[in-house]
Regions:
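Short beta-strand-to-loop acidic/aromatic patch adjacent to the donor-nucleotide binding site
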Residues: 142-154
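Conserved donor NDP-sugar-binding/catalytic core segment of glycosyltransferases
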Residues: 154, 160-187
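Conserved nucleotide-sugar donor-binding catalytic segment
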Residues: 191-249
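A conserved acidic beta->alpha catalytic loop
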Residues: 92-102, 120
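Glycine-rich, basic loop-to-helix element that forms the pyrophosphate-binding segment
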Residues: 120-137
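Short, acidic, metal-binding catalytic loop of nucleotide-sugar glycosyltransferases
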Residues: 76-85
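Conserved short acidic donor-positioning loop in nucleotide-sugar-dependent glycosyltransferases
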Residues: 78, 92-95, 151
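N-proximal low-complexity "stem/linker" segments adjacent to membrane-targeting elements
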Residues: 9-77
Length: 249
């Protein structure tokens, strides 16, 4: 038997496009979709330690991402999150004059998205912009948890909320499974080893992430960050969430 949320969503989706994709009906469909996502994923963490804080949106999640002349898929995925207390910091790799009008319009449409740029293009897999992002977070952006991603990555709508639900007082970082373009978009079961996890899979407490820092500008910089997180808190304070909540592209 279908849940009420699923049935109502299906009913509204049968309306003509000029009705279902506008105004109050569109907002209702989005809300129902979010509720259905949370219903279907509730078994992942049946009794979240921070249930009340998550329900009240007390935690702020910061996402740091490089960007270079690309459409910000990441921003679209965050705007669609079931959890709305987040701030996205885009750091453009060099002057941003060539970023497209559509991308610029999307970035400017949401006050939770902050945009800065480096003085010169580094062209080092986005690591210099990430380092600048860490400096910006440390000096100017308050929050509780931090995620490092990339502008063309996609976080499924329940990513932020489900990752937060996995935390408790004995957990400093949570990581999830992913779908990866390098592996034909199949489900990729992550583990804390080189080539088996991407930084976009990981959410860490802000203080732990800043203490680890972004220290490597080589191709292996993503893994070095995860490795430095492990050095900061130890594997026992990492928790694995067995769900594919992140799409690397």
């Amino acid at each position: 038997m279908k849940a009420v949320t699923e049935s109502l969503y299906s009913l509204l989706s049968r309306l003509p496009p000029e009705i279902r994709d506008k105004g109050i009906v569109l907002r209702a469909r989005n809300r129902l979709r979010h509720w259905e996502i949370l219903r279907r994923t509730s078994p992942l963490t049946p009794n979240p330690a921070y249930h009340n804080a998550i329900k009240d949106r007390d935690f702020k999640v910061i996402i740091v991402s490089p960007i270079y002349k690309s459409f910000p898929v990441l921003a679209v995925s965050l705007i669609e999150q079931t959890y709305d207390n987040w701030e996205l910091l885009f750091v453009h790799d060099g002057p941003s004059g060539e970023i497209g009008d559509i991308a610029k319009s999307l970035i400017e449409s949401d006050k939770r998205i902050r945009f800065i740029e480096t003085e010169q293009r580094a062209n080092d897999w986005g690591h210099t912009p990430r380092q600048r992002g860490f400096q910006e977070v440390e000096s100017k952006i308050e929050g509780d948890f931090l995620v490092v991603s990339n502008s063309d990555n996609y976080h499924v709508p329940g990513y932020v909320e489900k990752m937060l639900e996995a935390f408790d007082d004995s957990t400093d970082a949570v990581y999830c499974d992913m779908s990866h373009d390098y592996y034909s978009w199949r489900n990729f079961h992550t583990r804390l080893e080189y080539s088996f996890v991407d930084c976009g899979c990981v959410m860490a407490r802000r203080d732990i992430a800043l203490a680890a820092g972004w220290n490597d500008n080589s191709y292996e910089g993503d893994w070095k960050y995860v490795s430095d997180l492990v050095d900061q808190c130890g594997t026992k304070r990492f928790k694995k969430l067995n769900a594919t909540l992140f799409v690397h592209s």
